[in-house]
Structure formats: C-alpha cells, structure tokens
Amino acid sequence: MLVKEREEKLNRVLVALLGIPVVFSIIRAKIVETIGYFIFWLGGFSPYVYEKITHQEIPERTKLMLSSSVFLHSVMGQFLNFYEKIFFWDKILHFYGSFVITYFFYQILTKKSRFWDEVPGAVLMAFLLGVFSGVLWEIAEFTTDKILPDYNTQKGLDDTMLDLIFDLLGCYTMAKIVYRKKTGRFFWRPRS
C-alpha cells in the first residue's frame, strides 16, 4: 500500500474517532460538551471542505497532521482527560497545533488556488498566520471562560502566557523547517 493511501486511511479513522466523544456526550446529556465535540468533529472535515471551495488540493500528510492535532486535543485531551492526567499535555499540544497550522498555511500559500497565485513570502506569512491562530485560540478560551464560568479552560495568566510561548515556538520551528527546505539554509541573508 502506498504511503499516501495509508495516510488517507489513517486520516479517515481519526476523523471517524472524533465522533466518539459526540455520541458519549449526547448519551450523558451534556449539551455544552456535545456542541464542543461536534465542532471539533466538523474540524476534522474542514480540509476536505477547503479543497472543494478553493479547488486546491491539500497534501494527505497535511490533512493527517491537522486531524491528528484535533484528535489529540478533543479525544485524548478532553474526552480521555489527558489535560489533567499528563503534565505538560496542554503545552505539547499548543506547540504541535501551531506547528501543524503553520505548515498548513505554508502548504496553501505556496500553491495556486481559485483565489490566489503563490504568495511571495509564504514562509513569513505562514508563520504570522500560525501565531495569529494561537492568539485567536487564547481569545476563544477566554471567551469560553466568560460565557461558561464553570468550564475553566484557562488556569490563569501564567497558563495563557505559556500557551502563547509554545504557540510561538511551534510556529517558529515549522517556519524554520520549511524555510530550510525552500532555501537550503536556516537563516535569512540579504541578497548580494
């Protein structure tokens, strides 16, 4: 079996597994949890929706990275309670999630789509969009805590700042990887 086919099958399994917490939260009559898990389940389908809208193919490995990030958060972190059971789980996922989203943005910005041609400075733009995604995530956590006071997604300022630091590190690491792949060097130099 080809690598792409294996990645495609694994991705479909992960997206299907994202539905398990939805079913269990419905059975337990936890409406807020059900909505949250359902949103993450839909997130597993979002690369396919994106492809249809933009007429731009996302590499299977990128889709797998995205769905694994959602799976690690939703199923492992929330549903199986790894956020409480495993020290540093939250920080690992902030790093990995930002790493993945930066790679996703790089992939889509370096290919022609229905709406744009290749974006100059795609590495920098992907880095900035990745960091912005991390900031939006923290705003979503803050908003959730204000709307649902018993939910407690943020553990205080230290937690928020460390989350943002790990988001930044994940984005920076991926930006360095794709910059190295694109240019053959790790550091920017002015043109001669």
UniProtKB/Swiss-Prot annotation:
Subcellular location, principal: membrane
One Gene Ontology cellular component: plasma membrane
Keywords: Cell membrane, Membrane, Transmembrane, Transmembrane helix
Localisation: Cell membrane
Membrane topology of the entry: Multi-pass membrane protein
TM region(s), chain numbering: 31-51, 119-139
Record-given protein name: Uncharacterized protein TM_0562.1
Native species: Thermotoga maritima (strain ATCC 43589 / DSM 3109 / JCM 10099 / NBRC 100826 / MSB8)
